[in-house]
Amino acid sequence: GKQYDLYAGALFHTEVEALEWQEAGSRWLIKTNRGDEFTAQYIGTGTGPLHVPKLPGIAGIEAFKGHSFHTSRWDYNYTGGDPKGAKMDGLANKRVGIIGTGATSVQCVPHLAKACKELYVFQRTPSSIDIRNNAPTDPEWFNEISTEGWQQRWLENFTANQTGDNTVEDLVMDGWTDLSRRVRSKIMSLPPEKMTPANMIAAFEESDFEKMEQIRARVNTIVEDNVTAEKLKAWYRQLCKRPCFHDDYLQAYNEPGTYLVDTDGQGVEKITEKGIVVAGKEYELDCIIYASGFEVGTEYKRRAGYDMVGRDGQKLSEYWADGMRTKHGVHV
């Protein structure tokens, strides 16, 4: 906030509770959970689709007597550390379980593995973990590419690579552009006379299989325990689940005291006062961390926190009762 001088025009840690159109004055009336009331001629609702935490529907979740929290509500008072990466010294003598192995967990596990006395990662389905190659930016390289308008050029190049444009250059060169270019290259290598829908699909599948075999083979080169390595291999096609890219996640399973608890696709059986049960075995824990993601597909007013009221008192939820519709729109 301070870096970009946002405090003069922003209300942080504030939730909008009501948004109502006022015919008199032709303005929107905005009410917040802090008691604010103000008006605006135009509004932009950048509430996003993924911000309401979702806890797993596991039997006994309320019975646990230890500490617990969702990853999006990280409790630094318990773990120690801070958002800048300070050591989480509050976990040095703790047995911690984390439920989930998706994109959030992949980011958390490497830090937890170094901080906890014991870390148990409860896995239903393994994520595909490709190389991220996250390294410090070379200043000389950046000076070469950061000429006026470079952000727009890179945005357009990324969009072109992701939307099927046969652009030769890949400025971004990350896992997402590689995925698109790899598939497109395989398809475009077909002779013109064999460019049929069936052959194009087969080429797509071949490209996907080759990449997933590469990702699975990488697990063996990193994870020292063979049983753990096999359980960490994504067995599905790359886009069946959100692809993940990380340089330290797989390595975390080589840390002493870090254990993968694979549930063989069944998920956690139940939660007790003392910990988590999988396949009849109870794992006693001091803390449970829920890396269980966010609500998807719930009605917009539940996730936004308000129901927009327009002309003649009509609520947006009523207007959208049969599906979303709008005359114009801007994607945020």
Regions found by a protein language model. Give the residues of each.
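Surface-exposed intrinsically disordered loops and tails
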Residues: 83-84
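N-terminal FAD-binding dinucleotide-binding subdomain shared by FAD-dependent oxidases/monooxygenases
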Residues: 1-62, 66, 77, 88-93, ...
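Hydrophobic/small residue at the entry helix of a nucleotide-binding pocket
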Residues: 104
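Aromatic pocket-lining residues of Rossmann-like dinucleotide-binding sites
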Residues: 108-112
